Design a protein with these regions (language model features):
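Active-site proximal loop and beta-alpha junction motif in alpha/beta enzyme cores
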Residues: 1-191
Length: 191
């Protein structure tokens, strides 16, 4: 979802090669470039174009919420809710989400202090809710860029830990900037 890439880039830039400005990772489907930024690390992900889903019947029961629109990206469903409060207060049925044919389910709405807010549910992957899902923002930013008619977007993922991201939508890529912090440092001894 981007965590491992961001953490790897943070480790590379801060401990393995402090003079480096960028590193390229080979992901499942494409390369992901990580670049040092003034305010964190920018991951350049392939743009994910939303495809509108017309049958909304399974989404309202799974989310216990009124659903405005549903889209499908490469991996995830994306559900548009009424407002930030609907996203923040959502209490989903993870069993119904787990039965869906996708990696995960994103809920989103226009933000009050940022351009858009979201949450990402992925019980199919063993993670009921992810704190900050970089890969989901390739779809989210592409969608909201079209709604707001701008390419430079601020985002907040409303998980318990809250993730703040900056997204820049380009022709074929979405640049997502976030921050990483050193949590633990140690030595591993292998015998």
């Amino acid at each position: 979802c981007g965590h491992a890439t961001l953490a790897s880039a943070f480790t590379y830039f801060n401990f393995l090669n402090p003079d480096a400005h960028e590193i390229v990772f080979q992901a499942n489907r494409s390369e992901i470039k990580a670049v040092k930024a003034n305010n964190g690390i920018t991951l350049s992900l392939p743009k994910d174009e939303p495809r509108k889903i017309l049958d909304l019947s399974t989404f309202s029961p799974a989310l216990n919420a009124e659903v405005l629109e549903v889209y499908k990206g490469i991996d995830d469903f994306m559900v548009v809710l009424e407002d930030e409060a609907a996203v923040a207060n959502n209490e989903p049925d993870f069993n119904l989400i787990k039965a869906m044919d996708s990696r995960g389910l994103i809920i989103t709405a226009k933000g009050e202090e940022v351009d858009f807010v979201s949450r990402w549910y992925g019980p199919q992957t063993g993670i009921n809710e992810d704190p900050a899902t970089g890969s989901a923002h390739a779809l989210l930013a592409t969608y909201w860029s079209g709604i707001f008619n701008k390419s430079d977007l601020s985002a907040k993922q409303l998980s318990k830990r809250v993730g703040l991201l900056h997204c820049l939508v380009k022709e074929e890529k979405v640049d997502i900037t976030g921050q990483a912090a050193l949590y633990l440092r140690g030595t591993l001894q292998l015998n």
